[in-house]
Amino acid sequence: MAAANAPIIMKEVLTLPSVGIGQQFITFTNVTMESDKYICVRETAPQNSVVIIDMNMPMQPLRRPITADSALMNPNSRILALKAQVPGTTQDHLQIFNIEAKAKLKSHQMPEQVAFWKWITPKMLGLVTQTSVYHWSIEGDSEPVKMFDRTANLANNQIINYKCSPNEKWLVLIGIAPGSPERPQLVKGNMQLFSVDQQRSQALEAHAASFAQFKVPGNENPSILISFASKSFNAGQITSKLHVIELGAQPGKPSFTKKQADLFFPPDFADDFPVAMQVSHKFNLIYVITKLGLLFVYDLETASAIYRNRISPDPIFLTSEASSVGGFYAINRRGQVLLATVNEATIIPFISGQLNNLELAVNLAKRGNLPGAENLVVQRFQELFAQTKYKEAAELAAESPQGILRTPDTVAKFQSVPVQAGQTPPLLQYFGTLLTRGKLNSYESLELSRLVVNQNKKNLLENWLAEDKLECSEELGDLVKTVDNDLALKIYIKARATPKVVAAFAERREFDKILIYSKQVGYTPDYMFLLQTILRTDPQGAVNFALMMSQMEGGCPVDYNTITDLFLQRNLIREATAFLLDVLKPNLPEHAFLQTKVLEINLVTFPNVADAILANGMFSHYDRPRVAQLCEKAGLYIQSLKHYSELPDIKRVIVNTHAIEPQALVEFFGTLSSEWAMECMKDLLLVNLRGNLQIIVQACKEYCEQLGVDACIKLFEQFKSYEGLYFFLGSYLSMSEDPEIHFKYIEAAAKTGQIKEVERVTRESNFYDAEKTKNFLMEAKLPDARPLINVCDRFGFVPDLTHYLYTNNMLRYIEGYVQKVNPGNAPLVVGQLLDDECPEDFIKGLILSVRSLLPVEPLVAECEKRNRLRLLTQFLEHLVSEGSQDVHVHNALGKIIIDSNNNPEHFLTTNPYYDSKVVGKYCEKRDPTLAVVAYRRGQCDEELINVTNKNSLFKLQARYVVERMDGDLWEKVLTEENEYRRQLIDQVVSTALPESKSPEQVSAAVKAFMTADLPHELIELLEKIVLQNSAFSGNFNLQNLLILTAIKADPSRVMDYINRLDNFDGPAVGEVAVDAQLYEEAFAIFKKFNLNVQAVNVLLDNVRSIERAVEFAFRVEEDAVWSQVAKAQLREGLVSDAIESFIRADDTTQFLEVIRASEDTNVYDDLVRYLLMVRQKVKEPKVDSELIYAYAKIERLGEIEEFILMPNVANLQHVGDRLYDEALYEAAKIIYAFISNWAKLAVTLVKLQQFQGAVDAARKANSAKTWKEVCFACVDAEEFRLAQICGLNIIIQVDDLEEVSEYYQNRGCFNELISLMESGLGLERAHMGIFTELGVLYARYRYEKLMEHIKLFSTRLNIPKLIRACDEQQHWQELTYLYIQYDEFDNAATTVMNHSPEAWEHMQFKDIVAKVANVELYYKAVHFYLQEHPDIINDLLNVLALRLDHTRVVDIMRKAGHLRLIKPYMVAVQSNNVSAVNEALNEIYAEEEDYDRLRESIDLHDSFDQIGLAQKIEKHELVEMRRVAAYIYKKAGRWKQSIALSKKDNMYKDCMETASQSGDHDLAEQLLVYFIEQGKKECFATCLFVCYDLIRPDVALELAWINNMIDFAFPYLLQFIREYSGKVDELIKDKLEAQKEVKAKEQEEKDVMSQQNMYAQLLPLALPAPPMPGMGGGGYGPPPQMGGMPGMSGMPPMPPYGMPPMGGY
């Protein structure tokens, strides 16, 4: 059966590799397909990612970098579910993402691993763990809900599917497990069926299952079915079954009968098993898909087998339902995505014909609405009708596929049945059946509605229409209109009977719906007529209708201006305005005229409306000058100002401030330029300064930045309006920092009497010019002095203020200023009053009135400056008596006491409140000792030092410095820059320190001397303290300091100090002495304190006398001392002495250095003694290893053997390697043998020339490197037998083979190498390299064995390598064979042709050349055969026939002159109709005079130079050849040449046939004349019939009559008359039919017109509007011009549109 006729169509939708999916990822665990929408692939290389393939756009996959163990796309939407194992646990983390929203919907961490999961519904995931099954909804925040536990039969099964029934009441889980031991290849299938309602499970054997819904006849509710397929092995028999069972049968309802069927597997598929099952809900078919690609198709209702075929050569591992087409998708291992669908054109014929199952064919055709069962259905219908089974017939007609019985004939059949009394009419039964099944067609709907309307059951119609059971049509609407207009309108709308719908809406006056409906259906009604109709009754409705028209897509169907005219013709100004305002909202330039119009009509009739329009700023393209004039006339001055663009116009209008809103006028100023604005302001001030001042001030405030503040100020100043200036600057002041502005504001406020404002600004402003303001206020002499006080107080003009007030006798303001305003400035006031010679009583009273608020310091300064300090005595004493602790009070009082010499020392020592610096400074010139007292009391270091230096009071200075104990002070007085340093040091050493009893003071002084780097002075100081029996003689720190200072400053005294002092830090001082290179002193210190190690180190490291150190060590006999000596000896290279010393010291710590030194000096005997001593205390691998090495160096091999047998920690491997490296092979041999290091032992034995032992050791080592070393050594020693033993163990390693081969070859051992390789062929681990290398060796050294070797082992050779070897050695036959084996046919062919004596063999070459890829080699092969083997060239050409360019081959042979040689080849390829081949063969046939073959060639192959061939053979001596030439001319359309050539040879039949085929009347008639001239009457008669269509009857009759051949022309005439009369009859018949059609059409048009006239009253005629004033009549013509009429001159033209006349301009 051809694939085109198969009932199932298979199509490859795509291949996964074609969209970039790697073959390794096309597996069950990596690929998922949950529906026919998406395929999801999980990749793990080159990086973890998930690929989502949308089946609508498969070549645009979405790849996202995601790491997961599994990924599932939602069946319906772009939602992705991901599963990944939590690292280090057996838990799985689940996540659900919305890819489009890029948001995570839900996540959950499962406590156990999910073995399988699947989308069971678009909102639900099924999760299968090792023990249980869970459901997880993607909606809400719910966690997975456990549904049931897995049954035992699914333990250790691989879960392959999980599904739920459509009502989610039944669940099925499917798994597979290894087959039984008797049949392990057949995989077991297990199924668990679970009922959600009953909470019970049932275990069954099945490989695949699926749920379905099926309506059982007699049951309106669908039944839930499960179908499952199984294949099991029991008792040696394989059973394959398909089961279909109903789940949860409905009580009291018909149930589905259980069905089962066999699955027939072919013998080659005995171990195949079902892996998937899909149920087509569209056709109710079951698809069973097996692993090896078999497809079984069964009917769901009957379980009848329909089809079986193999749909995939590769195993199928995944399927998914393709619900839209009633098929399924399948994915196989190769990555093909296959789509299986029902072949709707062939499946019914297949079932009825091939399967002979007529009932199934009919049922499936009805169920799936499929073609192919028409005859069966019609026949069955007729049978039922004949049997009066009307109900069954009605059901069959209702279910008939593709509605073949849903015709008027069927309705007529039921109508024709007579109705029995008391029974339902069959027609109603038929319609009832149709209504239960679905929707009626238009004819059925009309017929049923007639019945219902006649019975007045309108409600039935409404119900059916609501349920969409009827197909609406215009005829149905016309029928229903007779009973219900509303219902008819609904039907018209559904039937898209647009004219009827528009008429109905117009009848209902629902004009807005007309527009909506017309837009929806694309209908264009008469909008003008509709608008006029609405205007008559509903002006506002007309506005709404016009606006709806304006919003239509594609623009308003009626011009806006026309619509406006319609409104204005009826004086509907408000409606016209409303319409225009709405449609002109876009404010487009093309609407300028309409914008002007709407403004004009409203400015004349409703100015307030026009004002609102203009205020909203809706329009910007109207005639602004025209509107400006109209606004001015209407009194809308602000609008006219906005529209005028000339300054005179603006100035004329703007003075009407009485009618202009002030705020609007202010805003208008903002639209003018600064120059025009100033001009207008001047006019306003000129007209009415007082009345317009507020507006001007407001405008200046608002636009001061644009106008310029200076310009505004000048404007007010020009009109001397200080009031305006005051109000203007008052608002601007807070924003300005201009001093001039602030000053002018102060000036304006002062001149307008705003004293409080002057006071406020002078107090708060920071920007006015203080000097200028002060002068202005002094000149103004305001009655209130507070503004002046503010200025002078803030800007430091207090003396000027005081002088002004004192001279103007404003003493009250002086007191007020000092007491209330700023008491802090009282000193300045007092100073100025003193300067103004004010009475002291007033001043004292002023001071006392302020008292504690008065700042004392500046007051004292002011009085002290003027030598009037005593003036303050009473004031100061008064403050002290009040308990004042103010330093300035006490300073002033002290100065007065010092000046009066009233016991100043008592005051200086007892008063705690004065400032020592101030008072001390005051005393310096009066009494320096008093200054020292004051400075000492205040610790004024710098001042005290300065005054004592200046007055040579060094003893006081020394005592003060010692007592202060201040480091900074000491540093200052001991610095070199101090010229009095020596005098101070002398006083400190002689007086201050000896007097001191404080250790802290001494310590501070010593530290200061050290810091100042005065060592000699410090020694002098310390000797005075330490050596002269003072209180500090035994002080530990001072003794250390004395010695250390001496070390630094005077080393000659150090030894004396060491001998005289005992209480110092010996170790520390000794180290310092060493650092100072006082080695003997250091040695003496260390000896004195018994620090022997430090002492010997001084001798060794500093004095560098090993002899003294050895002598010292013998004297003290301490191990530590000997250890130091040994180390020094070791450093100096006295290794033996050092070893002796280390032994005396019993010191093992330096064994590494001793070993190193011993090896350097080769003193291994001493080293052995030392290491034996060390071993007793230390267990170190290094020690034992070095001991063995030392034994080896002194050749004590016996001790080595004894030592390694004893317990030790030596690193024997390392020792052995070291001995081997230093060629101590015998010792190394002992070590390697002991530690069983056979590899090293082998190479050691090689060094010792012990080859047999080396081979034995190498065998034990079994290391490639060892084998190589031993092998190469044996080869060098010509021990080839042993070398071969080694070599066989080497060449099995691919990497080492070439090295062995080169080693043998470099030494000329070719035969031995070949013998080794030949032996290697038989090895179990023999690899390609051995076979290849042996082939290379044969090619080089034993050519005769090469071919045999290649043929025997061609599959085990590295052919490219051997190809190179054969090419180098020029073995062409073998090279060709190798090229063939390697599929390099181009190179093989080239080699054969280039080296044909050795390499060519015909059969082999044919096989080669048929497979070459380079096209040029074909033609090279043709040349090669032409030159060397021409006898068999056709054999070669036939092999290459499908690949050759035949034209090129012919050219090659033609140039070579051997064209005939390839005639058989050309005959074979002539079917390709190649011009060169055709011409070559025709040429050969012509030369051979083979006219039959030539004619056959011309007929069958037309690609050649026809005229050239004809010209070549038209003069041939053979007639048949000339006939061929004529035949060629005929085929080429050269009719005359062909006929002339045939005439020449008397070939009259050919002439007639040529003339007939030419279609040329003249040519045929000329031939008739020729036959008449030749007297060929029979030819004349024959020619009339042959050329019947070309010869005109009058010409034939004329020629026959003239030439007396009427008898011969008569047959022709009879035939012509018969044909002519038949044509006339046909024409008459056609004309009669056309007349009938015209009459029928006219009658139909009349019927349509009468039908339309029924609704004429609904659409009144468009009557003209009544005449309006100024218009001649109705219609749409322009109004006549009135200006030129008699008696009307001087009148302005009347306004159009019925508007009242406008005023003149």
Swiss-Prot record:
- What subcellular locations does the record give? Cytoplasmic vesicle membrane; Membrane, Coated pit
UniProt-annotated stretches for the region WD40-like repeat 7: 315-343
- Where is the region WD40-like repeat 4? 156-205
Q: Where are the annotated segments for Distal segment?
A: 537-648
Q: Where is this region: Globular terminal domain?
A: 2-492
| Residue numbers spanned by region Trimerization | 1564-1705
UniProt signal peptide: none
Q: Please give the residue ranges the record annotates as the region WD40-like repeat 6.
A: 271-314
At which residues is N-acetylalanine found?
Answer: A2
Q: Where are the annotated segments for Involved in binding clathrin light chain? A: 1227-1536
Could you tell me which residues belong to the region Heavy chain arm? 537-1705
Q: Which Gene3D superfamilies match?
A: 1.25.40.730, Clathrin heavy-chain terminal domain (2.130.10.110), Tetratricopeptide repeat domain (1.25.40.10)
Its cellular-component GO annotations read: clathrin coat of coated pit; clathrin coat of trans-Golgi network vesicle; clathrin complex; cytosol; Golgi apparatus; plant-type vacuole; plasma membrane; plasmodesma
Q: Show the segment(s) annotated as Binding site for the uncoating ATPase, involved in lattice disassembly.
A: 462-478
Q: Where is this region: WD40-like repeat 3?
A: 114-155
For this UniProt entry, the molecular function terms from Gene Ontology, in alphabetical order, are: clathrin light chain binding; structural molecule activity
- Entry's Pfam families? Clathrin, Clathrin-link, Clathrin_H_link, Clathrin_propel
Grouped into one coarse class, the protein's main location is: membrane
Q: Which PANTHER family match?
A: CLATHRIN HEAVY CHAIN 1-RELATED (PTHR10292:SF34), CLATHRIN HEAVY CHAIN RELATED (PTHR10292)
What does the subunit comment say? Clathrin triskelions, composed of 3 heavy chains and 3 light chains, are the basic subunits of the clathrin coat. Interacts with SCYL2B.
Homology family: Belongs to the clathrin heavy chain family.
Q: What is this protein called?
A: Clathrin heavy chain 1
Source organism of the structure: Arabidopsis thaliana (Mouse-ear cress)
